[in-house]
Amino acid sequence: MSRQIIAPLARYNLKLTVHYSWLLSAVLLAAVPIFIDPVLMDRLQVAKLGEFLVSLLGLIVYPHLGLLEDGGIQEVLYAKRVRHLPLFLFRWLLTALYIFLAVAALFTWIHGSGADFELWPMVGGTAITAIVIGSAGLTATLLAGNLSAGYIAGFSWYLLDFTTKGKLTGPFYLFGLLKEPWDNGKWLLAGLSLTLVLFCAFWLPRRRLD
């Protein structure tokens, strides 16, 4: 594929991916410092903030990706040269990068302001939780063809683990950072996220033919 096609296609997909939900999530994260005092926070308190609140960032920014095709976007112009899989993965990865940077910015400020915790395990673990919740919501949105279904599915998983403390989800427990500074179960959640996005990427062309 020539550079003349790649550049405008990348810009177009960037414009599609950067949704108003990004602005909403940024505003919500920016408001967090108003309600906390980092000097008084230990590792467990920061973990609760990340796992219970910041992780919902993923549910805000991911599900709409499952409905981008419903608006009749202009990728048909490149249909003979561009496969859908890399485009969908580009959008998902771009959103994952946004989540990681947003989480890193917030926790870097909290850490620098006096909170006592290991920074990067907290950033990575919280970002993975946000991404897997969002990917679950994205998958439900795609399968149901309805944005509300995505929000309900993602939040249902969140609520299930919040109330049962992982008794029903086992190694796929979302909030492992509450137990230790780094939970190896996060790697399973990261793998599940990749599995879900690959499923979505392969399923979406079928849905477009329905």
Residue ranges and their predicted role:
Residues 1-9, 84-85, 115, 131-132:
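Juxtamembrane loop-helix boundary motifs flanking transmembrane segments in multi-pass membrane proteins
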Residues 34-68, 89-154:
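Secretory targeting signals
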Residues 76-84:
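Short helix-to-coil transition segments within interhelical loops
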Residues 111-117, 174-181, 196-200:
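Short alpha-helical linear motifs
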Residues 65-76, 139-143, 169-179:
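A cytosolic-side transmembrane-helix exit/cap motif
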Residues 1-51, 56-67, 139-142, 165-166, ...:
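Hydrophobic alpha-helical transmembrane segments
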Residues 147-191:
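Transmembrane helix segments
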